[in-house]
Amino acid sequence: MTNDIKVVIEELLFYAGKNLDMYEEDYILRRNNLLDLLKVDAPADAPVDNCRPLQEILDDVNEYAAENHLAEEWEKINFETRVMGLLMPMPFQVITTFEQLAASDPALAMKYLYNLSVNSNYIRKVDIDKNIGWKVANPRGDIMITINLSKPEKDPKAILAAKNAPQTAYPKCMLCKECVGFSGNAARPARQTLRTIPIILNNEVWHFQFSPYVYFENHCIALSDEHRPMHIDADTFERMFDFVELFPDYFIGSNADLPIVGGSILSHDHYQGGSKVLPEMSAPSKKFFTHSSFENVKVSIVDWYNSVIRLEGKDRKEVKELAAHILKCWREYSDKNVDISAKTRNEPHNTVTPIARFNDENHYVIDMILRNNRTDKAHPFGIFHPTEDLHNIKKEGIGIIEALGLFILPGRLSSEAHGIRDILTGKTPLDFKALSDESNPLSKHIGMIAQLANDFGTSLTEEEAATRVTDYINDACVRILDCTAVFKHDEKGEQAFDRFMTYCGF
């Protein structure tokens, strides 16, 4: 390592003083903590009066740690987090500052916590900025696509270490409040830089934090104090409206509470939100309804890919009660003409993905995306799940973020798309035998490659090949959203949607 570790430590202290609310009285303690962690016997002769960008400093720390056998290469991010954790303000200080700011300006409080999350490297912005994203124009609504390059593939040594590590049930999951300060291990990320804010939602303690993955602007999470399964009911809508009243510039939504149509974590009740207007929220209404018991609520079907009912009104209680009524009706609703069955024996299939916010008129809004997770022999992954020919692009469940029109695609797709382009330009011969080998990273795309080669040949220019591959991905994402619609965009589906609205009393 070319830089003196003692000077690197002083750079970290200088950075924390400028960016992590570190008080003058904290410097000696923080310096000694860093000296202890890095096994350095004494500090530099003098503090520094400037520092390099944080990641450059941390790269030096990691190099030093590897040279001195303080951490394995695969432990790099966890070790960085441990270092930064020694420089973080304590939870009480963060909560106090946040609440003082929120008392006069909630937006300023949110900005404070977000900046702290970035400055502490909890949100790894240097990595997140590597993500590739673009907008797709479509007559039924624009969508956004991101290829997630910020999440590195797991190192084989890390996988082996996780397999051999003692199994622990602490914390119970990565959304539990006990994750604040958690040291991490081979199987779980370190969270010494995580800070959460307690908030009251429907008379319960919940905890607010920003997501480390930042899939969209100010991507945040609200999680229940208790480790309990995801569940959507009338209380969900109360909590969501409490949240948007606390933070009026934000939306909040919940993944569905059933497998296949829910998110990746169903074991811990939580919501996701942010300040960005995601594509579905901008979609117009295409058909309006009235209900004699809820005359002051504007009700409509949204002109969007999946099946969405939008409720808007000044009266919070009335909007919430109508949402609860629709949820109750949907939970028990079946229509075999369009493959909707509420239950198989005692297993429920119908649920919703709800999203709450204020509109431009400052009215309460809930968008309810109707979901159904039933499977059958012809659709083993789900009747309203992406069909198997789309699994090379997206096989996982379609959660709230994708349902709202923002696709987060795996980082592997970037290199795989490049490989497909090479076939379309003729750089790589089209060899179906080689593509059929499951060890070939392009094997999952064999159908896509066959279609593109048949339609456009294998003598395209680089630009033409890139366009064809991107167009294919764009079309696949549109089709994926269409798959999730419980009422399809044809005459049969629209009539079925009307029957459900009639069932609800509209």
Pin down the residues of each PLM region.
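Helical scaffold of the NTase/Pol beta-like nucleotidyltransferase catalytic core
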Residues: 192-197, 225-252
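Catalytic or ion-translocation cores adjacent to nucleophile or general acid/base/metal-coordination motifs
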Residues: 235, 244-267, 273-334
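Active-site microenvironments that recognize anionic phosphate/pyrophosphate groups
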Residues: 1-229, 305-306, 319-323, 329-406, ...
